[in-house]
Curated annotation (Swiss-Prot):
Belongs to the class-III pyridoxal-phosphate-dependent aminotransferase family. HemL subfamily. It is found in: Cytoplasm. Homodimer. GO terms for molecular function: glutamate-1-semialdehyde 2,1-aminomutase activity; pyridoxal phosphate binding; transaminase activity. GO terms for cellular component: cytoplasm. Its cofactor is pyridoxal 5'-phosphate. InterPro entries: 4pyrrol_synth_GluAld_NH2Trfase, Aminotrans_3, Aminotrans_3_PPA_site, PyrdxlP-dep_Trfase, PyrdxlP-dep_Trfase_major, PyrdxlP-dep_Trfase_small. Keywords: Cytoplasm, Isomerase, Porphyrin biosynthesis, Pyridoxal phosphate. Coiled coil: none annotated. The modification N6-(pyridoxal phosphate)lysine is found at K268. CDD domains: OAT_like. It catalyses: (S)-4-amino-5-oxopentanoate = 5-aminolevulinate. This is Glutamate-1-semialdehyde 2,1-aminomutase 1.
Length: 432
């Protein structure tokens, strides 16, 4: 493929935009460098870049484009909203309708508040949990990404009995000292940390199904034990369902897994592609939020008509019968094909899949936590990524990210992708 225009555009972008990208995850730094491909148009399961190259898209904007690009029902809703004015700064009927839809989908949401991003949703659930409990410390699992607010950009300390350290310049050590990080899927270290710090902990942040060091499911009984131990300590359980809500099941991971949190943070998928976030939970906890309670949160763009209309339309599409079964069927087909190609070409991989999302790790180890995900071959993934790009298959430029299927992918797309994987694996095998 020819990437001349993408390369020229990136060179120009470097003159005007920090690093040439508006989110570091779009950079090709983690896959060997080079100019990231600039896309010009998306439709269904496909992208076309500025050079005219066509791709089957498995990035799906890091998950939220579950209905495919430019879905006609969602596009029509956005267009209608735009014609009526995109921002009022007042209550609307749309926000009430959308809140009711979210509550019907996720029974753990007694009350809901809309915001503008997943980062904002998580940030506010932390504030609400602190207000409700009167405590300050937060727990999280290593490797799980909860946005870019200071409190969640914290890496693990040297063990479960030590506090965190800043994971970004500009995050004060004093903030990191309010965060305890423990490994995912490990009850013993969670218990040890709660034994030491539990009386100071306001809440634990949980990705019920991990999506930020690949797709990693909780071990059987793990989430139930998290609820039990955290509640025994008098703290709250916050589910970050920014990736998982409406991705694996209409009612989110909490419905799929049958475990109920106290608070839930939402984003991405629920907006149908427009900027959005939301948080909600038990009535007595949510009533800590202004104007009813002392926990302040506000936003001019929150609940704007365009995002509300897009979100309503997205959920209407996702209510279609058989939609999630189709995603699971295509995911299983893709998984089987990739594993067969890996065996054929003697390429060592571990593949984690849940329904319509999967991650290919270049390792033979089982991936159940962040340490295992880190100990995979990033250089091999970078080569694989570039080979797949040449084949017209668009993936996320990171070994930690997932492949996301949409409702618009077809069996023919999957068949082509498997063939492309085979050619990429053959090239990798030839250069071992």
């Amino acid at each position: 493929m020819n990437f001349t225009k993408s390369e020229a555009l990136h060179k120009e972008a470097l003159e005007h935009i920090v690093g040439g990208v508006n989110s570091p995850s779009r950079s090709f730094k983690a896959v060997g460098g080079g100019a990231p491909v600039a896309m010009e148009r998306g439709k269904g399961a496909y992208f076309w870049d500025v050079d005219g190259n066509k791709y089957i898209d498995y990035l799906a904007a890091y998950g939220p484009i579950i209905t495919g690009h430019a879905h006609p029902h969602i596009t029509k809703a956005i267009t209608t909203a735009a014609e009526n004015g995109v921002l009022y700064g007042t209550p609307t009927a749309l926000e009430v309708k959308f809140a009711k839809m979210l509550k019907e989908a996720m029974p753990a949401l007694d009350k809901v508040r809309f915001v503008n991003s997943g980062t904002e949703a998580v940030m506010t659930t932390i504030r609400v949990a602190r207000a409700y409990t009167g405590r300050t410390k937060i727990m999280k699992f290593a490797g799980c990404y909860h946005g870019h607010s200071d409190l969640v950009l914290v890496a693990a300390g040297s063990g479960p009995s030590t506090l965190g350290t800043p994971d970004s310049a500009g995050v004060p050590q004093s903030i990191a000292q309010e965060v305890i990080t423990v490994p995912f899927n490990n009850v013993e270290t969670l218990k040890e940390a709660l034994d030491k710090w539990g009386h100071e902990v306001a809440a634990i942040l949980v990705e019920p199904i991990v999506g930020n060091f690949g797709i990693v499911e909780p071990k059987p009984g793990f989430l139930e034990k998290v609820n039990e131990l955290v509640h025994e300590a008098g703290a709250l359980v916050i589910y970050d369902e920014v990736i998982t809500a409406f991705r694996f099941m209409y009612g989110g991971a909490q419905d799929l897994l049958g475990v109920t949190p106290d608070l839930t943070a939402l984003g991405k998928v629920i907006g149908g592609g427009l900027p959005i976030g939301a948080y909600g939970g038990k009535k007595e906890i949510m009533e800590q939020v202004a104007p009813l309670g002392p926990a302040y949160q506000a936003g001019t763009m929150a609940g704007n008509p365009a995002s509300m209309a897009s979100g309503i339309a997205c959920l209407e599409v996702l209510q279609q019968e058989g939609l999630y079964e189709k995603l699971d069927e295509l995911g299983a087909m893709l998984e089987k094909g990739i594993l067969e190609q890996a065996a054929k070409h003697n390429i060592d991989i571990t593949l984690n899949r849940l329904k319509g999302a999967l991650t290919v790790y270049f390792t033979t180890n089982t991936i159940e936590d962040y340490d295992a995900a880190q100990d995979t071959d990033g250089e091999m993934f970078g080569k694989f990524f570039k080979l797949m790009l040449q084949e017209g298959v668009n993936l996320a430029p990171s070994k930690y990210e997932a492949w996301f299927l949409t409702t618009e992918h077809t069996k023919e797309d999957i068949e082509y992708t498997i063939e492309a994987v085979g050619r990429a694996f053959a090239a990798l095998a030839d250069n071992k």
